[in-house]
A protein has these predicted regions:
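Short amphipathic beta-strand/extended segments with alternating polar/hydrophobic composition
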Residues: 122-128
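Low-complexity, Gly/Ser/Thr/Pro-rich intrinsically disordered linker/tail segments
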Residues: 129-137
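A broad, low-specificity signal marking well-ordered, structured residues that form hydrophobic/aromatic
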Residues: 4, 110, 132
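...with weaker cross-activation on analogous glycine-rich loops/strands in unrelated enzymes
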Residues: 1, 58-122
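N-terminal capping segments
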Residues: 1-56
Length: 137
């Protein structure tokens, strides 16, 4: 099974608003050894891609920071569907980022399948100008 196939199998999993937390979101942390995470409000884009890569038997960062994926796999200029996409958040120099899987480019946007996108696993468009790298696992 590919990372993309694992991720697609989770499509639609979402956070629970309020005091309850979705055990499906928490498993992305717990099955990777991050048992200290107790709520689904903790940023989980990297946990999700780590979990998918683990189940696909591919390399993973094992870290919760999206930019940790800049050290996993091989950088590619032209991505294939399912390659890892790393974006910056706030500013290119910030430690903050987002990680997901490449679906397609259209105009000035990259469509990414990922976790914690609108608080769920879904495909969402991001501005191409926020791209840091594409990575092949």
């Amino acid at each position: 099974m590919t990372v993309l196939e694992v991720a697609l199998g989770q499509y639609g999993i979402k956070e629970i608003v309020g005091k309850k937390h979705n055990p499906e979101v928490l498993k992305y942390f717990h099955e990777m050894g991050h048992d200290w995470v107790k709520d689904d409000e903790t940023a989980w884009c990297s946990a999700f891609i780590n979990w998918c890569a683990m189940w696909a038997d591919k390399p993973f960062s094992d870290k919760l920071n999206a930019r940790s994926w800049l050290d996993v796999g091989t950088e590619v200029e032209i991505p294939d569907i399912g390659d890892v996409v790393i974006l910056w958040r706030e500013s290119p120099g910030s430690w903050k980022g987002h990680v997901g899987l490449f679906i397609r480019e259209a105009g000035n946007y990259i469509y990414i399948l990922g976790g914690n996108q609108n608080n769920q696993v879904c495909i969402k468009a991001y501005p191409k100008k926020q791209l840091l790298e594409y990575r092949k696992l």
